[in-house]
Swiss-Prot record:
Gene3D superfamilies found in the cross-reference section: Urease metallochaperone UreE, N-terminal domain, UreE, C-terminal domain
Gene name per UniProt: ureE
Lineage: Bacteria, Pseudomonadati, Pseudomonadota, Gammaproteobacteria, Enterobacterales
Localization per record: Cytoplasm
Keywords: Chaperone, Cytoplasm, Nickel
Transmembrane segments: none
UniProt protein name: Urease accessory protein UreE
Organism: Klebsiella pneumoniae (strain 342)
Length: 158
């Protein structure tokens, strides 16, 4: 079995690819099936969040596997009003919802209760099968050199 042990800072030309949903891209130890049918084991540093486009390598540096973010069932909110998007982010964040934030658009794993809440604010929510790349804070450390302060204690009431 091929063991992928590192994410390359400077990606090399891929020799293979693997399509993974976010719930697998947050795991440091997991067995996966490459798009060519071969099995591989991810043996990566804990806390690493894989993003679409990342390239993984085996220890020998002879295999280079590009990560592809799988299409997933997501709710999509599109809005030109930054205030309304900020309001949506506030309410979703208050519920600790993993959230992908882009200019004029939000994505989260499809949830009809959350969809209904945002519709009550007057936002349009649609369903899509799209790649999901949530903010790293929802899962793990960012994979591209972004560093965020972490506090030993985090508590608040709801």
């Amino acid at each position: 079995m091929l063991y992928l042990t590192q994410r390359l800072e400077t990606p090399a030309a891929a020799t293979a690819s693997v399509t993974l949903p976010i719930d697998v891209r947050v795991k440091s130890r997991v067995k996966v099936t490459l798009n060519d049918g071969r099995e591989a084991g991810l043996l990566l540093p804990r806390g690493l969040l894989l993003r679409g486009g990342d390239v993984l390598s085996n220890e020998e540096g002879t295999e280079f596997v590009q990560v592809i973010a799988a299409d997933e069932g997501v709710s999509v909110v599109r809005c030109d009003d930054p205030f309304m998007l900020a309001k949506a982010c506030y309410h979703l964040g208050n519920r600790h919802v993993p959230l992908q934030i882009m200019p004029g658009e939000l994505r989260y794993h499809h949830d009809h209760v959350l969809d209904d809440m945002l519709r009550q604010f007057g936002l349009t929510v649609t369903f899509g099968q799209l790649p999901f790349e949530p903010e790293a804070g929802a899962y793990a450390s960012e994979s591209h050199g972004h560093h965020h302060a972490h506090h030993a204690h985090h508590a608040h009431s709801h």
